[in-house]
Amino acid sequence: MEYFYTSQCPDMDHLRSLSVANRWLETDLPLGDDAKDVAALSEPELEFYRFLFAFLSAADDLVNVNLGSLSELFTQKDILHYYIEQECIEVVHSRVYSAIQLMLFRGDAAARERYVRAALRDEAIRRKVEWLDSRVAECASVAEKYLLMILIEGIFFASSFASISYLRTHNLFVVTCQSNDFISRDEAIHTSASCCIYNNYLGDAPRPDEARIHQLFAEAVEIECEFLRARAPRDSLLLDLPAIISYVRYSADRLLQAIGASPLFGAPAPAADFPMALMVAEKHTNFFERRSTNYTGTVVNDL
């Protein structure tokens, strides 16, 4: 062990620096301004967004139970420092999700608790958790565990983030959409970090072959798309389900390319009017390098 800092992983140090430059707090965003918009949602739409935020708020705990702390595998301080930054921003995400949940239940904390406990037993969420359970159990190497982390961070949140962003197209929940931009931006860094570690810092750990990689990606994308189809409100004008599903598949192909695998889905890039302000890791990086300070201003479309 070295008892002083030396740079060993400049790419991971760059990702840590991006995280530091874009720190934010739950107090930066006045979510109370969005409370008036709850009444603008139909009951099926309100149910859908309550469900999404129940999943997102619980996702970190569900993941950690299965994959544990991958940071314990490393001694390089750049990687350890990066993970400290990631843990700090995940605390902010958790607090923001809690505040949004409470807003969607009009301040009724008991109703929120009952709902979340029931939602976590829903088949759409259980399918994600059970898939992760089974794939962790059969992991042949730490590299495959990192593949699962890439899929969780890069695919299993994708339809939720996109669905939340559609509220912006109706001028609803402006601050919630801004927090969604920040959180999806943060998760893009987390996904990039997992890809970076997978590519560069797992030593001699055997990598899955491309057939196995494609199998895991195909399963994760199918589960994510079915998650959306199962819970999205019928006949709602808020969402464009085909566009979100195409976005999930496009995101999967970009991640495959990021780890040196061939694309699987051939989905086109999202249209210019797709409401996600930030969509892929490269765009996120460009956004971060500009260091946004407009926490309460207009969200920049960086497509």
Curated annotation (Swiss-Prot):
Native source organism of the sequence: Suid herpesvirus 1 (strain Kaplan) (SuHV-1)
Bilayer-crossing regions: 147-167
Places the protein is found: Host membrane
Annotated function: Ribonucleoside-diphosphate reductase holoenzyme provides the precursors necessary for viral DNA synthesis. Allows virus growth in non-dividing cells, as well as reactivation from latency in infected hosts. Catalyzes the biosynthesis of deoxyribonucleotides from the corresponding ribonucleotides.
Positions with a binding annotation for Fe cation 2: E90, E153, E187, H190
Name of the gene encoding the protein in the UniProt record: RIR2
CDD domains, per database record: RNRR2
Active site (record annotation): Y97
Biological classification of the source: Viruses, Duplodnaviria, Heunggongvirae, Peploviricota, Herviviricetes
Quaternary structure annotation from Swiss-Prot or TrEMBL: Heterotetramer composed of a homodimer of the large subunit (R1) and a homodimer of the small subunit (R2). Larger multisubunit protein complex are also active, composed of (R1)n(R2)n.
Cysteines paired by S-S bonds: none
EC number per UniProt: 1.17.4.1
Record protein name field: Ribonucleoside-diphosphate reductase small subunit
